[in-house]
Design a protein with these regions (language model features):
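Acidic-leg catalytic submotif of subtilisin-like serine proteases
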Residues: 1-30, 40
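Extracellular S/T/G-rich loop segment that most often corresponds to the catalytic His/Ser-adjacent loop
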Residues: 3-10, 130-175
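Substrate-binding/access-modulating region of protease and related hydrolase catalytic domains
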Residues: 14, 48-52, 61-137, 143, ...
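Second-shell loop/turn segments in exported
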Residues: 29-32, 92
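Buried hydrophobic packing segments
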Residues: 41-45
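Short, solvent-exposed loop/beta-turn-alpha elements that line the ligand-binding surface or hinge
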Residues: 55
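Short, small-residue-rich loop/turn micro-motifs
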Residues: 59-62, 171-173
Length: 175
């Protein structure tokens, strides 16, 4: 495949059946099969789609780099050829010039950084900015429920996603 996606996260299970043959690189020290966040994100992005197992991904015939959850790893993924770099994590609630410079460098190198806008309790509330999603040159993604609800359970603001001025796109979420 000519498409390489950098997945920056933690807790990948490299032995998972949906990841077999799907990644070209994995930063050492990121494995933990008991916690599924990195594995789940990687499978959604580019897990096996034609193996009659589990769930199909959105990135048929796509390869991944499985990398750590840092700005240095975003830059490393970019220079290693990742055209798309996922960051389904929050590093903080305030702007960092260093982090913005890294994002800009990866962007100028031809990489699109896609980041989750954050969970609603992140940074003090759903309307507050969370980073890296709020940086320039990042495609910030949030979700909405089937009744245009921001909360997983309407009326329960403890389980929600960020909906702020940095959000670029809203995808279907929850059930």
């Amino acid at each position: 495949s000519s498409v390489v996606v950098g997945v920056t996260d933690t807790n990948f299970d490299p032995t998972h059946e949906e990841l077999q043959g799907k990644y070209t690189y994995m930063t050492s020290g990121l494995t933990n099969s008991n916690i599924a966040h990195g594995t789940s994100v990687a499978i959604t992005i580019a897990g096996g789609t034609d193996n009659s197992l589990g769930k199909s991904s959105i990135g048929y015939n796509t390869q991944m780099q499985l990398r750590g959850m840092t700005y240095n790893e975003i830059l490393a993924a970019s220079y290693a050829g990742a055209k798309i770099i996922n960051a389904s994590w929050v590093s903080g609630c305030s702007f960092s010039q260093y982090a913005q410079d890294v994002i800009t460098e990866a962007y100028n190198n031809g990489s699109l950084i896609v980041a989750s806008a954050g969970n609603g309790t992140t940074c003090g509330g759903a309307s507050n900015l969370a980073y890296p999603a709020a940086y320039d040159h990042v495609l910030s993604v949030t979700s909405v429920g089937p009744q245009d609800n921001h909360e997983r359970f309407p009326g329960n603001s403890l389980i929600t996603h960020q909906h702020n001025t940095a959000v670029d796109i809203c995808a279907p979420g929850y059930d």
